[in-house]
Swiss-Prot record:
It comes from the Bacteria. Pfam families: ATP-cone, Zn_ribbon_NrdR. This is Transcriptional repressor NrdR. Coiled coil: none annotated. The gene is nrdR. Belongs to the NrdR family. It comes from Thiobacillus denitrificans (strain ATCC 25259 / T1). Binds 1 zinc ion. GO terms for biological process: negative regulation of DNA-templated transcription. A zinc finger (unnamed) spans 3-34. InterPro entries: ATP-cone_dom, NrdR-like_N, RNR_NrdR-like.
Amino acid sequence: MKCPFCGSLDTQVIDSRANEAGDAIRRRRRCAACDKRFTTWETAELRPPQIVKTNGTREDFSETKLREGFRRALHKRPVSTELVDAAVDRIRQRLLTLGEREVPAREVGELVMTELKKLDKIAYIRFASVYKSFKDPDDFRDVLEDLAQGPQAGDDPA
């Protein structure tokens, strides 16, 4: 590691500890050339996947765009910002842990539907009507029947 004070590459680790969450390591280092001490942090770099849209184009995952989708679906609904933030974080974390470089937009949409179903049934119906391009009242009826049946096998109970 290059010393930030003198630029020397001759540094030694004198202390190394994991943070409380266990997802980063703090290292105390000493430069052999100038004897100054400095701290470095080591974390894993997880890059979100590219989203492959239905027309085949690719775009970077956008947490802002995801939040905006939740905001539109939850417009004038009694759901706290904290709950939305938690849902967005779960989706982001899920996408990161997939380990895939590309994820179909359809898969992101399904994750949003799962989260909205837990947060607010009306928002779920709103989102589903746009996401699944409802054409007639029967499409709404199908979703309402699905909601009335309760959780299905494979639905996340959290």
